[in-house]
Amino acid sequence: MTGGVMSQKFVVGAGLLVCSVCSLSAMAGSKPVDLILRVLVDAPPPCSIKGSQVEFGNMIADNVDGTNYRQDAKYTLNCTNSLANDLRMQLKGNTSTINGETVLSTNITGLGIRIENSADNSLFAVGENSWTPFNINNQPQLKAVPVKASGAQLAAGEFNASLTMVVDYQ
């Protein structure tokens, strides 16, 4: 939540609460009312994230099948002064749909990068509305694997894809 949005909600909520208290005291006579407000200021966790490049090496286009060329997508997440251990992760990037899955887009038509959870090779959601909860002591391990659209004839050449990792409190 951004600071501006929270401030607006607090001011509106406090205004409604004050008006309600004023109208009740006017109807019931003059009585003092104690009011206790608790406000939680939500700030992003103080984490640092260091990513790395995933090198797939030389690939044979006909062997790109969503299994071959799987590589660890290593990163370092450090949240030493975090207020809580329960966090959530979001991966953002340009995506496309290949064979029914949302994958990272590359600069080669018909080629994408599938991001997987290393624990079971399941698809790791990529997108603005996809958050994955985790505990700082058990961070998700990711893998990247090239995928080819059914029937695609991949052009030879280097390819690129990138993603951004966002970490926040649950």
From Swiss-Prot:
Note the InterPro entries from the entry.
Answer: Adhesion_dom_fimbrial, Adhesion_dom_fimbrial_sf, Adhesion_dom_sf, Bact_Fimbrial_Adh_Pro
Lineage, broadest ranks: Bacteria, Pseudomonadati, Pseudomonadota, Gammaproteobacteria, Enterobacterales
Gene Ontology terms: biological process: cell adhesion; cell adhesion involved in single-species biofilm formation
Family of this protein: Belongs to the fimbrial protein family.
Q: PANTHER family this protein is in? A: FIMBRIAL SUBUNIT ELFA-RELATED, MINOR FIMBRIAL SUBUNIT
Pfam families cross-referenced by the UniProt entry? Fimbrial
Its gene is yfcR
Q: What cellular component terms from Gene Ontology apply here?
A: pilus
Please give the name of this protein.
Answer: Uncharacterized fimbrial-like protein YfcR
- Signal peptide (residue range): 1-28
So what does this one do? Part of the yfcOPQRSUV fimbrial operon. Could contribute to adhesion to various surfaces in specific environmental niches. Increases adhesion to eukaryotic T24 bladder epithelial cells in the absence of fim genes.
**What triggers its expression?**
Expression is negatively regulated by H-NS and subjected to cAMP receptor protein (CRP)-mediated catabolite repression.
**Disruption effect?**
Deletion of the operon under classical laboratory conditions does not result in any major effect on E.coli capacity to form biofilms compared with the wild-type strain.
The protein's UniProt keywords, in alphabetical order, are: Signal
**Additional observations:** The operon is cryptic under classical laboratory conditions, but is functional when constitutively expressed.
Key word Signal present = yes
